[in-house]
Amino acid sequence: MNLINSTKIFSSLMIASVENNTAIFSLNTDILETNLINLLVIFFLLIYQGRPFFTALLEERRKTVLDKIKKSENSYNEALEKLKEAKSKLAQAELAAKQIYEEAEAVAESIKKTGLAQLEKDIKRIEETTQASINTQQLSVITYLRQQVALLALRRVVSQLKNYLKPELHSQFIDRKILQLRKQK
């Protein structure tokens, strides 16, 4: 409704004339026709009576804008604090990650060294065990061979003695020994 009244007022103040396909606007200076007095009364009432209303409205709007600005500033400051805290936590996390990585590398290197040292010990132990096993086997084989050589030598001696001690030689040997014993008495 305000829009309709304002267009009526505007149209009453301005007169449009169209001549030769061109629009020309001009100001209507007839006071009675334009309701200038009515307009002045309305403007006076708006300014005089509406001033406290518009002042209060503008003051409330100003307070709302200031409150929103303060809230925005507070939010901005809180966001800056949170960003600062997040950066601090990020730096701490990066430092912790770096320390964990360094510790992991140290542990891996230690395990590697320990593993290599243990591997060398195991290889040395296996070599020693193998050498001891070989030595034991050699002694066992040497002992077996000595026994076999001794057994073979005894068999040869027995065989040779059997050849030398035939019953006739055996009787002669016994007789000689008996004679030697008699002589000694």
Curated annotation (Swiss-Prot):
Membrane-crossing residue ranges in chain numbering: 36-58
Membrane topology: Single-pass membrane protein
MF annotations from Gene Ontology: proton transmembrane transporter activity
One annotated GO biological process: proton motive force-driven ATP synthesis
Presence of keyword Metal-binding: no
Cited SUPFAM superfamilies: BAR/IMD domain-like
Xref: CDD domains: ATP-synt_Fo_b
Keywords: ATP synthesis, CF(0), Cyanelle, Hydrogen ion transport, Ion transport, Membrane, Plastid, Thylakoid, Transmembrane, Transmembrane helix, Transport
Pfam family, one: ATP-synt_B
Subcellular location: Plastid, Cyanelle thylakoid membrane
InterPro entries (UniProt xref): AH/BAR_dom_sf, ATP_synth_b/b'su_bac/chlpt
Function description: F(1)F(0) ATP synthase produces ATP from ADP in the presence of a proton or sodium gradient. F-type ATPases consist of two structural domains, F(1) containing the extramembraneous catalytic core and F(0) containing the membrane proton channel, linked together by a central stalk and a peripheral stalk. During catalysis, ATP synthesis in the catalytic domain of F(1) is coupled via a rotary mechanism of the central stalk subunits to proton translocation.
Family, similarity comment: Belongs to the ATPase B chain family.
Quaternary structure note: F-type ATPases have 2 components, F(1) - the catalytic core - and F(0) - the membrane proton channel. F(1) has five subunits: alpha(3), beta(3), gamma(1), delta(1), epsilon(1). F(0) has four main subunits: a(1), b(1), b'(1) and c(10-14). The alpha and beta chains form an alternating ring which encloses part of the gamma chain. F(1) is attached to F(0) by a central stalk formed by the gamma and epsilon chains, while a peripheral stalk is formed by the delta, b and b' chains.
Record's protein name: ATP synthase subunit b, cyanelle
Protein species of origin: Cyanophora paradoxa
Annotated gene: atpF
